[in-house]
Each structure stands twice: as C-alpha cells, then as structure tokens.
Regions:
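N-terminal ligand-binding/catalytic initiation module
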Residues: 1-110, 118, 128, 302-305, ...
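Short helix-loop-beta connector
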Residues: 124-131, 153, 219-220
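Glycine-rich Rossmann-fold phosphate-binding loop(s) that bind the pyrophosphate
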Residues: 137-138
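NAD(P)-binding Rossmann-fold cofactor-contacting core
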Residues: 151-177
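Short acidic-hydrophobic, aromatic-tinged amphipathic segments that line or gate anion-handling sites
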Residues: 182-192, 250
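Rossmann-fold NAD(P) dinucleotide-binding segment
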Residues: 191, 195-196, 207-223, 239
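Short, well-ordered coil/turn residues at beta-beta hairpins
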Residues: 201-204, 226-227, 252, 308
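Rossmann-fold NAD(P)-binding glycine/threonine-rich loop
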Residues: 226-283
Length: 356
C-alpha cells in the first residue's frame, strides 16, 4: 500500500497547520535540502511543448529518496473553466524503487513556490522592506501574499492585473483572510503599483515574452521576485533590467534557468548565482542597500522533493484520514505476478468467455 494525499487531505493539513505555518515549515524544509545541494542528482526538467502549453516532468534524488512531479502549464485553460497549472507527484525509496507517496501537487506547487520566493527574499530584499507590488493576481497571488506578509513583514500590498476580474478575486479572498496589519491597494497600472515598492512580485501566465517590467520602473534597492517566466519564450522582465550595473541575479538551478528563466534573454557569459550558494553563504545575496536584486524563479525539482517529503511527514503527524491506495500488487511470491489474477478465478473465466 502506498500513502496517498489528495486535495481534501491537503486542505485538512492546511486547516490543522495554518497556511502561514505550513509555508514557513515548507520554506525551512526547502532550505535544508538546498543546503545539501551537492548530494542531489539534478537535471533540467523534461518539457514537452505545444502551441498552447507545456507538460513537464521534474525529477530529483538524494540517493536515498527519489521524487518527480508531473506538471502542466496551459495559460488559456481558464477560458474553458480549467486550471492553468495542475500537478501531482511521487516520492519513492531508491533502494527498492517502491513508491512511498502519491500526492496532489497543484495546491502544493503554489505553496512551495511562495515558500521558495519568500526564502530567497529573506536574504535578498532589504531588511526594512514593507511594501510589495503584486503584478499578476491569478492562482499564485494569495499564496505569495500570505508568505510575504507573515514571513517578510510586508504591510502594504499593491495589486495590478490586466484582467480586473483576477484582482476582484484576490481582493475577495484577502478580505476573507483578514490579514492583520496588511493594507491592500488596488492600482490601475503596473507603474502605479510598482512606484515606491520595496519588493515587486511578477506572477503572470502568458506563454510569451511579455515585458511586464521596463527599466524606467526600477529604482535602486528594489527586490524583484520574478515568478511568471518559466519556459522558453516566456519572460516578464525587459533585458535592460538585467543589464543594470547594480543588478544581482539569483537562480535556482543555472542550467535550467538558462533555458527557461529571465536569463534566457542573456548570453552564456552573463553572471548569476545559484540560490544554494546564497543560502550557504558562498555567494552574496545583496552587496548594499542600492543594489537591484532579482530572484529569477522558474521552479526546480528539488523544491518538489522537499514538498513531498514534508507532506509525507505531516500526513503521519496530523490526525485525520491517512489514506493509502493499492497502487502495487501484494504478492506472496514476488515471481508470481499472475497469481494476483489467479487468486480470483472468476475473472479468468470471464476473460475466457469473452475469448470464446
């Protein structure tokens, strides 16, 4: 039997843990795994692209556990009443190859993305950062808001989306959340949202090179949390922002970010640091208060490895329905796979009747 975590169980775990605590604990798990970076077998995700979206497989292993995530990205899905991003994942035992956990990762991907974003910002943003602009108010927006409000101390949130319905949705959800001490300001343009912000989060979905932020909007000292660019041909920042002499860019896994991140716009000699090096103190997060820092986030398999490991742990810690599924046959003789069927001869007889 294999542990199973569905959407209802994730909702139950969030209700018991609290979303802010869940994100904080997940960020700690991600940091722990990034700090043992060299123990992981890493590779860029395997992507199958179409004209309307992408389907990806994201593997990672530390030699003891193996994890993968299946995830899609289809920006036009919302027009058909479907999610832009859906995902599930597996955590397996390397020694036997047996899966230990099958889990939903649609909700969890949003949570781990917010956890990674705020983990990076805790090192890269100025320590007195209190104002965040949130450009793109779709599926990621609430999770980013909770993470940055509770874990970075954001007190003013400025919202803008080209689709006003997305901002309507976000405002409704933030009203329900009643985040103490957070002022929410609806803006009528990217420029008005960004003006005076300490942190700018871009989380847009269009599968194209979209110039969400232009050079004249960027002031000294700001931290850019660029979340939306995550596949070839899909970026959010004008390349001149990256060319600023005071810009410092941090990525998750450089070989993947060269393909999918904002730095796909740059040549191979463009210098970046990896988040693991920043967390370990081997690379600076910010040299001074005037540097423009950029977290070029595309999402990396190690974060999903951490998320699956965390989910399995709290699944066993918290009371409630500990679901398991018969994903694998249970055999008295591991060499007799057919025995699973012969234990129920009526099935074989039914098959014989069809053949006759």
């Amino acid at each position: 039997m294999v542990d199973f975590i569905g959407v209802s169980r994730v909702r139950e775990l969030l209700a018991r843990r609290g979303t802010a605590r869940f994100i904080a604990e997940l960020a700690a798990e991600i940091e722990t795994d990034f700090l043992r970076w060299d123990t992981f077998e890493k590779s860029p995700r395997h992507a199958t692209h179409s004209s309307v979206g992408v389907i990806e497989l994201m593997p990672a292993s530390d030699g003891r556990l193996y994890a993968f995530k299946y995830v899609n990205g289809h920006p036009k899905n919302t027009q058909a009443g479907l999610l832009t991003v859906t995902a599930f994942g597996v955590l397996a035992d390397v020694e036997t190859g047996y899966p230990l956990l099958l889990s939903e990762l649609t909700l969890t991907t949003a949570l781990r993305t917010a956890a990674t974003s705020v983990l990076a910002a805790s090192r890269m943003a100025r320590t007195n950062s209190r104002v965040m602009a949130l450009i793109g108010n779709g599926a990621q927006a609430e999770f980013q808001t909770i993470a940055f409000h509770h874990l970075l101390g954001i007190r003013e949130l400025r919202l803008f989306d080209t689709d006003p319905r997305a901002t309507d949705k976000l405002e409704r959800n933030l009203t329900r959340l009643q985040l103490a001490g957070l002022e929410v300001v609806r803006c009528n343009s990217t420029a008005s949202a960004v003006a005076g912000a300490d942190v700018v989060t871009t989380a847009t979905a269009d599968k194209r090179n979209a110039t969400i932020l232009t050079p004249e909007l960027i002031v000294a000292g700001v931290h850019l949390n660029a979340v939306g660019g995550d596949c070839p041909g899909k970026t959010e920042l004008h390349r001149d922002i990256l060319l600023r002499p005071d810009a410092r860019v941090v990525v998750e896994y450089e070989p993947q970010s060269r393909i999918e991140g904002e730095i796909q716009q740059m040549d191979a000699s463009y210098a970046v640091s990896e988040l693991a090096a920043v967390l370990a103190g081997r690379a600076p997060a910010r040299a001074n208060e005037r540097e423009v820092t950029v977290f070029d986030s595309v999402g990396f398999a190690l974060e999903d490895f951490s998320a699956l490991r965390y989910l399995r742990r709290i699944h066993h810690e918290e009371r409630g329905a500990h679901s398991r599924i018969d994903l694998l046959p249970q055999l008295a003789d591991p060499k007799d796979l057919f025995g699973v069927l012969s234990a129920h001869p009526q099935w074989l007889l039914a098959a014989a009747d069809v053949a006759a």
